[in-house]
């Protein structure tokens, strides 16, 4: 399959009129679309406080969730986002679908399109899977990348940026540090692109040499292999999960060694600016990349990220469907 995933060709995210039709990566997104998503998400936040938590924005539309990897937060919030927009939702259990019998991804999509599906949310272990589907469908249905291999996770980056903007102040005044397993992280790459477009003055990446790709410096980020030096002057800390399921054994001596050098503890949090926000995309490895005292502490905004993720994903679906315009 990977030989067909030429996801570097062109920008499939925009239609012929220059409108955002698919969300595949934060790379290649213009500032105006990023701001449109963030501002629309702000308007959708209030729905959670209503007695009837729905808006008719996508009434009559059908959204299919295809998750080829395990997920709790992303899958749940996409399902709830579509339902709160009044869409019909198909949750495809890939382990019991024809895909488990060898059916190709595009054949699966074609069969669902025959049922008049209007949009697809796709998580897949191979980088470029969502791009393959978007190229296959063109403008006939919207596609949202919910994570593809180590490549991208755009909605996670958008909800992180939304959280920073809402709780931490203007992004153009914040110094942001991304700490941990950057090598395997699709989230980090997506965060870097989004923060850069929105004018973040300094993005730092902190981690052991084996878990920080050398080519990141080409994106304009500052790379640190010492946690104390990297956290000095930082306003926002994004801690990343150690992705042991993707990791080759030689990249990490031990979990204890990682925590000793790069784990975020209350004492180390003091190296950053007073009141620095702490984010984590989840799921957390408590006692490895983040101590429970920090994860549950006053500076952590991890549960707020989850709540914001629902509003951001509602905004993405509404905008891609051409139906944004009010909650």
From Swiss-Prot:
Keyword Transferase part of the UniProt annotation: yes
Residues the record lists as binding L-aspartate: 101, 186, 241
GO cellular component, one term: cytosol
Pathway connected to this protein: Pyrimidine metabolism; UMP biosynthesis via de novo pathway; (S)-dihydroorotate from bicarbonate: step 2/3
Known catalytic reactions: carbamoyl phosphate + L-aspartate = N-carbamoyl-L-aspartate + phosphate + H(+)
GO biological process: 'de novo' pyrimidine nucleobase biosynthetic process; 'de novo' UMP biosynthetic process; amino acid metabolic process
GO MF term set: amino acid binding; aspartate carbamoyltransferase activity
Entry EC no(s): 2.1.3.2
Binding site for carbamoyl phosphate: 73-74, 123, 153, 156, 282-283
Keyword annotations: Pyrimidine biosynthesis, Transferase
Record note on quaternary structure: Heterododecamer (2C3:3R2) of six catalytic PyrB chains organized as two trimers (C3), and six regulatory PyrI chains organized as three dimers (R2).
Biological role: Catalyzes the condensation of carbamoyl phosphate and aspartate to form carbamoyl aspartate and inorganic phosphate, the committed step in the de novo pyrimidine nucleotide biosynthesis pathway.
Similarity section: Belongs to the aspartate/ornithine carbamoyltransferase superfamily. ATCase family.
Designated name of the protein: Aspartate carbamoyltransferase catalytic subunit
UniProt source species: Acidithiobacillus ferrooxidans (strain ATCC 23270 / DSM 14882 / CIP 104768 / NCIMB 8455) (Ferrobacillus ferrooxidans (strain ATCC 23270))
Gene that produces this protein: pyrB
């Amino acid at each position: 399959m990977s030989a067909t995933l030429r996801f570097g060709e062109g920008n499939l995210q925009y239609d012929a009129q220059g409108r955002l039709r698919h969300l595949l990566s934060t790379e290649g997104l213009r500032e105006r679309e990023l701001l449109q998503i963030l501002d629309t998400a702000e308007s959708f936040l209030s729905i959670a406080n209503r007695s009837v938590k729905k808006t008719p924005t996508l009434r009559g539309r059908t959204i299919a969730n295809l998750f080829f990897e395990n997920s709790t937060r992303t899958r749940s919030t996409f399902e709830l986002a579509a339902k709160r927009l009044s869409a019909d939702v198909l949750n495809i259990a890939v382990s019991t679908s024809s895909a488990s019998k060898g059916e190709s991804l595009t054949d699966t999509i074609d069969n669902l399109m025959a049922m008049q599906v209007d949009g697809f949310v796709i998580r897949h272990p191979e980088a470029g899977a969502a791009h393959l589907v978007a190229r296959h469908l063109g403008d006939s249905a919207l596609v949202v990348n919910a994570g593809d291999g180590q490549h991208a996770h755009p909605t996670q980056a958008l909800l992180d940026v939304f959280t920073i903007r809402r709780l931490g102040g203007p992004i153009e005044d914040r110094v942001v540090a991304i700490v941990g397993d950057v090598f395997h992280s699709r989230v980090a790459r997506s965060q870097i692109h989004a923060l850069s477009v929105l004018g973040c003055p300094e993005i730092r990446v902190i981690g052991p040499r084996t878990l920080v790709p050398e080519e990141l410096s080409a994106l304009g980020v500052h790379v640190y292999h010492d946690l104390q030096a990297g956290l000095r002057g930082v306003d926002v800390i994004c801690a990343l999960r150690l992705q042991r399921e993707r990791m080759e054994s030689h990249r990490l001596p031990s979990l204890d060694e990682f925590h000793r050098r790069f784990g975020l503890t209350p004492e180390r949090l003091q190296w950053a600016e007073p009141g620095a926000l702490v984010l984590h995309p989840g799921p957390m490895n408590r006692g490895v990349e983040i101590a429970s005292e920090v994860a549950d502490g006053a500076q952590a905004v991890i549960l707020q990220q989850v709540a914001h993720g629902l509003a951001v994903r509602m905004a993405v679906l509404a905008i891609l469907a051409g139906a944004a315009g009010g909650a």
